[in-house]
């Protein structure tokens, strides 16, 4: 089997046993990227020279392959994470030449673990989108059907993993941007608890929602990646100093006796019937594994979309105010005055969806509308969080669909922002509540499109989610499927 087709843990075993060199491994991936990625556009930049140089250090014995399970492993990084000396665009024209002078915390931790960075992946501009159609650098295509979207905003990261263009990747999840593309592309995607992973070096969209997490080929790989990046960071004031368990240690524990809740509000009217069928079959697998299953209500789920699309744009309008053409980013030439330079740089640098959300956020924060919109949205968020806390009093975890439909056609929802936003209805509540969630492959539609099972758990119980997902994965074969032709 080619190195690019292996999981991270399989690949690392071969590297440690010297059955493969790290240079051979990197060459395998780089050749595949050169051949296939022009059809997918999952990468915005490929770091061939630096990655091969790092591989050489391992092969010469200058770095130790035994140092960690990530030593010598080729990863892709969503282009919203600062990497020293590497262009970081956030999928936006306004940052097309921005080179960060430092590594974000997760990048620094992965470097220390010995991971090798293949490149930066495409994304919806500033992580605002659900399809990776909003990138200033072109749409990313789904490896299972190149006429369809890979999901978003971490679509490039998910597509790269699904197409074997990296061993694993990092994405970010503000309202579903790891879980939904993982579902659409048939891979594993984990959104950790808010505060579990440092956001230092993450270009902010909505600071109270953004979270970094792994996208991988299987659950064990997700545990390995999370192990490397989780933990307190004093440079991030929202990082929580909470013990980090050994995420691989509990993977093989049976789930017999666990109480799994099925939120009735997540099986919405208009859901694609094959989604509901696949999730029901996944629930039956968990029953066969000895779990106890029961219905639960999350009564304020219906307010999630409205609350999110008030809170997130409000935070974005503040965070994106820094892009004015003065310190960094696009600056238009020949502006007549300072205000004209601000206006023209921002209007030319930002795409349509980003402008829409900035305007929405500015509106809901304005004096006459703050109480009517932002305050009520914050109250709804509190109620949604309480729904989850109440549910976890009775259940260990929740099982649900990730999205109401499989991957949709490119351009199908582009002219209807509301329909695009509603596609996030099943992932937004967990983001608003700050609880962890994982998407694991659980089936395929009649058209051969992947479908994901969403598992949600209490704050800081990523270990439990990984255990449930792993046991489900071992009882099924959905995660082993790969696109036939790209």
From Swiss-Prot:
Superkingdom field: Bacteria
Catalysed transformations (reactions): L-glutamyl-tRNA(Gln) + L-glutamine + ATP + H2O = L-glutaminyl-tRNA(Gln) + L-glutamate + ADP + phosphate + H(+)
One Pfam family, short name: Amidase
GO CC terms of this entry: glutamyl-tRNA(Gln) amidotransferase complex
Secretion signal, residue range per the UniProt entry: none
Gene of this entry: gatA
Organism, as annotated: Syntrophobacter fumaroxidans (strain DSM 10017 / MPOB)
Phylogenetic classification of the source organism: Bacteria, Pseudomonadati, Thermodesulfobacteriota, Syntrophobacteria, Syntrophobacterales
HAMAP family assigned to the protein according to its UniProt record, in alphabetical order: GatA (MF_00120)
Task of the protein: Allows the formation of correctly charged Gln-tRNA(Gln) through the transamidation of misacylated Glu-tRNA(Gln) in organisms which lack glutaminyl-tRNA synthetase. The reaction takes place in the presence of glutamine and ATP through an activated gamma-phospho-Glu-tRNA(Gln).
Assembly information from the UniProt record: Heterotrimer of A, B and C subunits.
Name used for this protein in its record: Glutamyl-tRNA(Gln) amidotransferase subunit A
SUPFAM superfamilies referenced in this protein's UniProt entry, alphabetically: Amidase signature (AS) enzymes
PROSITE patterns on file: AMIDASES
Keywords, ordered alphabetically: ATP-binding, Ligase, Nucleotide-binding, Protein biosynthesis
Annotated GO MF terms: ATP binding; glutaminyl-tRNA synthase (glutamine-hydrolyzing) activity
Enzyme Commission designation: 6.3.5.7
Assigned protein family: Belongs to the amidase family. GatA subfamily.
Entry annotation: catalytic residues: 78, 153, 177
């Amino acid at each position: 089997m080619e190195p690019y087709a292996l999981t991270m843990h399989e690949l690392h075993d071969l590297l440690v046993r010297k059955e493969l060199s790290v240079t051979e491994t990197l060459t395998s991936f780089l050749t595949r990227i050169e051949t296939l990625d022009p059809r997918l556009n999952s990468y915005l930049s490929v770091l061939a020279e630096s990655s091969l140089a790092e591989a050489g250090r391992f092969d010469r014995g200058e770095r130790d392959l035994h140092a960690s399970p990530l030593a010598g492993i080729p990863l892709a990084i969503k282009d919203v994470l600062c990497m020293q000396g590497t262009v970081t665009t956030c999928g936006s024209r306004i940052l097309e030449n921005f080179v960060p002078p430092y590594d974000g915390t997760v990048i620094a931790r992965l470097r220390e673990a010995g991971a090798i960075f293949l490149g930066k992946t495409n994304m919806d501009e500033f992580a605002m989108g659900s399809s990776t159609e909003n990138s200033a650098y072109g749409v990313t295509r789904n490896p299972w059907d190149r006429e369809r979207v890979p999901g978003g905003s971490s679509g490039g990261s998910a597509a790269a993993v699904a197409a074997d263009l990296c061993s694993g990747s990092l994405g970010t999840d503000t309202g579903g941007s790891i879980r939904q593309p993982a579902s659409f592309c048939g891979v594993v995607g984990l959104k950790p608890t808010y505060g579990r992973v440092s956001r230092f070096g993450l270009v902010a969209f909505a600071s109270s929602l953004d979270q970094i997490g792994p996208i991988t080929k299987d659950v064990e790989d997700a545990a390995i990646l999370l192990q490397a990046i989780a933990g307190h960071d004093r440079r991030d004031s929202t990082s929580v100093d909470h013990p980090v368990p050994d995420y691989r240690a509990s993977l093989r524990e049976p789930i017999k006796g666990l109480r799994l809740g099925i939120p009735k509000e997540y099986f919405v009217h208009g859901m694609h019937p094959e989604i509901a069928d696949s999730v029901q079959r996944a629930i039956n697998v968990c029953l066969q594994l000895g779990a106890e299953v029961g219905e639960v209500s999350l009564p304020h789920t219906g307010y999630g979309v409205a609350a999110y699309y008030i809170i997130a744009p409000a935070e974005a309008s503040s965070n994106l105010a820094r892009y004015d053409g003065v310190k960094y980013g696009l600056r238009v030439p020949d502006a007549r005055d300072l205000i004209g330079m601000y206006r023209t740089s921002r209007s030319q640098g930002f795409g349509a969806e980003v402008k829409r959300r900035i305007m929405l956020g500015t509106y809901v924060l304005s004096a006459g509308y703050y109480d009517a919109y932002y305050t009520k949205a914050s109250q709804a968020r509190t109620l949604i969080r309480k729904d989850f806390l109440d549910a976890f009093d009775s259940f260990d975890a929740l099982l649900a669909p990730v999205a109401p439909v499989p991957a949709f056609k490119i351009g199908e929802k582009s002219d209807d922002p509301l329909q695009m936003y509603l596609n996030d209805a099943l992932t937004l509540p967990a983001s608003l509540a700050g609880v962890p969630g994982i998407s694991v492959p659980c089936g395929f539609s009649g058209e051969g499109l992947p479908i994901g099972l969403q598992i949600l758990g209490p704050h800081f119980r990523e270990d439990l989610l990984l255990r449930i997902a792993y046991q489900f994965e071992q009882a099924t074969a959905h995660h082993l499927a790969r696109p036939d032709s790209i």
